[in-house]
Structures are given as structure tokens and as C-alpha cells.
Amino acid sequence: MSESEAKSRSATPPSKAKQATPTTTAAANGEKKLTNKELKELKKQEKAAKRAAMKQANGISIEQQQQQAQMKKEKKQLQREQQQKREQKQKNANKKKQNERNVKKSTLFGHLETTEERRATILALTSAVSSPKTSRITAAGLMVPVVASALSGSNVLTASSLMPVGPNASSTVSASAPASTTTTLPASSAALSAGTSSASTNTPTAIQQEIASSNASDVAKTLASISLEAGEFNVIPGISSVIPTVLEQSFDNSSLISSVKELLLNKDLIHPSILLLTSHLAHYKIVGSIPRCIAMLEVFQIVIKDYQTPKGTTLSRNLTSYLSHQIDLLKKARPLSVTMGNAIRWLKQEISLIDPSTPDKAAKKDLCEKIGQFAKEKIELADQLIIDNASTQIEESTTIVTYGSSKVLTELLLHNAISLKKNIKVIVVDSRPLFEGRKMAETLRNAGVNVMYALITSLDTIFNMDVDYVFLGAHSILSNGFLYSRAGTAMLAMSAKRRNIPVLVCCESLKFSQRVQLDSVTFNELADPNDLVNIDYENPVERRGNKGALLNQFIKERKFEKKKLAMENKPKGNKIGGKKGSEGESKDASNEEDSNSKNILDGWQELPSLNIVNILYDLTPPEYIKKVITEFGALPPSSVPVILREYKGSA
């Protein structure tokens, strides 16, 4: 033991001495300890010296080594410059390509949503809703297979694609449906819809048998067990893209894409009547602030009647969020009018006041009755009071100028001409592109009223006549007294003010807004710019209302393919000179005919320096307005805040 201890003791001091030698020597010599960076640089120099020595041993002189190093350095610099040029060129090409494929927007109204964007959103959503498919978000967009979305244990179950097969197909399953769905699901199943039966041959036999022998809830669990991200996703045929890359490339607004995907993820909560109303609003089948509000309230009554409260929640808490999904879709048809916004706020307030202990059936019935009462009080009775108040301003043999079409103005003029037997003359001023005044002029003419119809371009001639009053409708009246109405109203009111013709505005208090606006740029609505372009579409698919980003892209690609195919099939040359000459003459004649028939604004989307803006509304300053006639009486525009306080208190 003593020998081993002695050996160990004798062995340890040398190692310690070796470890302490550098520091002690460095301290003795007064040198600093090298840092890691300096050590790495020293090792690098040692390696370089070794390589130089090896090259020199192989017969390469130091001068040659320096020349090789310089050449290598110059080569790297050249490669770096070429790489930068390629990156800059690619960046410019991508920027140019992005500008070409982006939806054209005016720099002044670039913050507003365009009609193309709204229609593309509706197209994407209706494609997803009308097809019985489940969705998932991929790099190419939101992909939907043929089989319905079914998540095990989820409250979202869309089984519209489960086609009934077999003798037990008539039975239905109500337990598997969520509480929020109003449709009954077929109990027996069937794996795929009839429209994709040809694609179902690729499905493995085991999965077909499993789906065919299961009910709807079992199909849901089976589909939930399939990993949509894995390769097994191929067992479900009929993949189609709802938001393809074309749509994403058309929009440079990321928030728009996210809102579209949000709508698609909640597509199972959209009521069919909301889809129908959205289509009517987007295609301008329902025009006007009050008609749009009445249509929305009627549809909300249907939605509330069909609504079923999910388990574990109450109607007063869940119905508000359920209606929010419907409202999000309505906003994509057209921006909500002020009357629609005020009605929605009132409805949500009424829902929040429902007692949670009230049965759902009684609460829904009471809510639908309140909606009907609200429409009657705030719209029908308000219009009747406005007609009574405004009739006192109209005397015998009065000439009245109106602009566009207004529900309350039409009823006012009919009441004075028919009920009160007043001999009045009405001049209906109209403008492109909606020509709303035509409907009003036709209604008055059919009732026997003396009507003159004119466009807004002849305004100077109209006011040179003996005009007594200018009656205007309103989309909204802001809290600072400005009138927010259809484009052209401000010009009409200003021209009347210059000629000392009183301007009277008939407006329900439901149209009053607490928003303050000084120009029509900050907040407005953009309509389709093609409505301002006088294009006679030969193809009915290209008419307004059927246009969309996806459809336009498809038509453009088809035209390009046809043109390319025609160029490929075109003969290389002509053997007969006379034939060539006759073809040249016919070609010149056709080109001349096309140039004569072509509109100057055709293909304006391809011109980068041209933007066509079709705004729907403008602002009329309060100094141009003499009175605002409401159900509370005739008031100056400065009294709008008082009415807002009264309306808010009564609501």
C-alpha cells in the first residue's frame, strides 16, 4: 500500500507542473493569455504555412501560389456579382409579374374592397357549400375531397354527401347530427356522391366495404381516422381546390385571403337563406338601404326559427355568435348599409336580454315577433309619418325634382298625386350605371303622375325650368350633418342651392349614423368598373353578375389555348400567290371591321396607367340642405346629434 501511494504521489506533481507551466511561464515573461479568437487565427496561419510548404515541396513557387490565390479571389468576386445580378433580375421579374396578376386598384381607393374580390370570395364559398366535401388548407389553397367533413366528437358534421344506398336508406339519424344543424342526415351511408362515382374506382375495396356497411356516425369516425396530411389521403377521390393558387395570386391582401379561409372553415354554419340573400345583394337584385334591411330582417327570422341551441350552451350566448357567421357572409356581398348595421346592433342587444331560463321555442318566437315589430315601427310607421310631414311642403301645381329611386319618395309622390289629388309634376333625374330612376319613373307613370325622365348630364337644362323643390332620399345622415347618398347627389344639391331651390331630404331615423366623415374617399363602396365601360357582351357568361376572378382566369386561359392551337394548326405557307393576296385583303378588311367595332375601353385591365373607378356614394355638405324630414318632424341637419341621442335612448 505504501509503495502504491508513493507512486501515485510521485506521479501527480508532474501533471500539475505540466498544467501550470504555460501560465507560469506566461506570467513570468509578462505575456497575455491568448483568446479563443487569437488561437483560431494562429491555427489558421499554421495550416496555411503547412499548405504553402507542401506546395513548395511539390514545385510550386510562392509567386505562383500568390497568383493562384489572387485568381481564386477574383473568381469568387465575379461569381458574387453575377449572383447579385441574377437575384436582382429575378426580383424585378417577380415584381413585374406580381403587378400584372394583381387585381387593379386605384391608388386613391386602394384601401377599399373591390367587386372582383367580393365576387371571388362568394364564388369560393358557394363552391365549397354546394359541393358535399370536407376541407383542409394546403399550400395550393383550401382543398376539399368528395366525402363530407366528419370529425369524430366534433360539433361540425356535414353529411350532405352521404348518399343513401340499400334498403335501409330511408331511415334517418338525428342523434348523429349536431344541435346547430337543421337538416336531417341519411342514416345509411354511402361513401361517395353520385357525381364522383367514376372516381370511386380508385378507392381501396376494404374502405369501400367499411363505409358501405356503416351508418353516418360510423362513417364520421372512419373519415376522422384517416390522416389527411399523409399519403392515405389519396384513398378519398375527387380532390378539388376551392381557393387555388390563381385566386391567391390575384389578391395582394393577405387579410382578404385569411377572411376567405375563415368563411370556408365555418361554411357548415351558413344558413341556405343567407346564401340566397347574399346572391341577390351581390347581383344588385335588391337595391336600396331600406329594401336591403327589410330583406335581411326577414331572412334573420327564418334563421332564428331554424336555429337549434347546442348542448351545454344557452340561446342568449350562442345565437349571437351564430348570427355573426351569417353577417360575415352578407358583408362579402356588399358592405352593410347603415340601416342594416343599426338593425343588427339592436337585434344582438335583444338577444343578450333574453332570460337563460326561457325555453328556446318561446324565446325564438318572441324574438321573431320583436323583429317584425321593429321593422313595422322603425320603417313602415316611420315612412308614413315622413309622408305626412313632407306632404305639407307640397302644394298644388308643384314641380319636384328627385334623383334616383327611393322607397319613401315614391310613396310620398303617389300619396300626394292619388290620395290628396294634387296636380304635381315630377322630374326624375337618373345616372349610370344602375339607372335606379327608371323603376321610379315607371311606377309613377303607371299611376298617372306627370313624369319627366332625364339624365344627370342635362342638369343645367332641368334647373332652368320652373322647379319648386328638390326631394332627395338618403343612404345615411352622419352625425356632423353630411348626407351620405348615391353618387351625384352632391352635384344636384349644389346646383339647386346656387339657384335658391330648397333641398329637402326624406330620411328615417334608422339611417342616422354616429360616424363622422368629411370626404367620400375614406369610406365608400366600389362597384364593378366594367359597368361604366360600354361593352356589348356576345357571351352571356361575361355579363355583369356572372363575372369572377376564377371565371375570368378560366376564360382567359381558354382563349389563349385556342389561339395557340390555331397558330399551331395554321399552314406554314401558301403555294398560290393569288390566294395569299386574297387572304391578305380579307385579313385587312376584318382588322378594319374589328377596329371599328371595338370599344376604346376594351381591355382596360391590361393598361397599367388606366384605372376605372365606379364609386356608389358621395357626401353632401349640410349647408346645401334646407331640411331633413324624419318621423320626428322637419329638422335642420345640425339637429342630427339630438335625434341620435333620442333614438339611442328609445332603442
Curated annotation (Swiss-Prot):
The modification Phosphothreonine is found at residue 121. Residues 1-108, 566-600 are annotated as: Disordered. The modification N-acetylserine is found at residue 2. GO terms for cellular component: cytosol; eukaryotic translation initiation factor 2B complex; guanyl-nucleotide exchange factor complex. GO terms for molecular function: enzyme regulator activity; translation initiation factor activity. The modification Phosphoserine is found at residue 106. The keyword Repressor applies. GO terms for biological process: cytoplasmic translational initiation; regulation of translational initiation. It comes from the Eukaryota. Residues 30-49, 76-90, 580-590 have a biased composition (Basic and acidic residues). Keywords: Acetylation, Cytoplasm, Initiation factor, Phosphoprotein, Protein biosynthesis, Repressor, Translation regulation. Its main location: cytoplasm. It is found in: Cytoplasm, Cytosol. InterPro entries: IF-2B-related, IF_2B-like_C, NagB/RpiA_transferase-like. Residues 11-28 have a biased composition (Low complexity). Pfam families: IF-2B. Acts as a component of the translation initiation factor 2B (eIF2B) complex, which catalyzes the exchange of GDP for GTP on the eukaryotic initiation factor 2 (eIF2) complex gamma subunit. Its guanine nucleotide exchange factor activity is repressed when bound to eIF2 complex phosphorylated on the alpha subunit, thereby limiting the amount of methionyl-initiator methionine tRNA available to the ribosome and consequently global translation is repressed. Present with 10300 molecules/cell in log phase SD medium. Component of the translation initiation factor 2B (eIF2B) complex which is a heterodecamer of two sets of five different subunits: alpha, beta, gamma, delta and epsilon. Subunits alpha, beta and delta comprise a regulatory subcomplex and subunits epsilon and gamma comprise a catalytic subcomplex. Within the complex, the hexameric regulatory complex resides at the center, with the two heterodimeric catalytic subcomplexes bound on opposite sides. Belongs to the eIF-2B alpha/beta/delta subunits family. This is Translation initiation factor eIF2B subunit delta. It comes from Saccharomyces cerevisiae (strain ATCC 204508 / S288c). The lineage of its organism: Eukaryota, Fungi, Dikarya, Ascomycota, Saccharomycotina. The gene is GCD2.
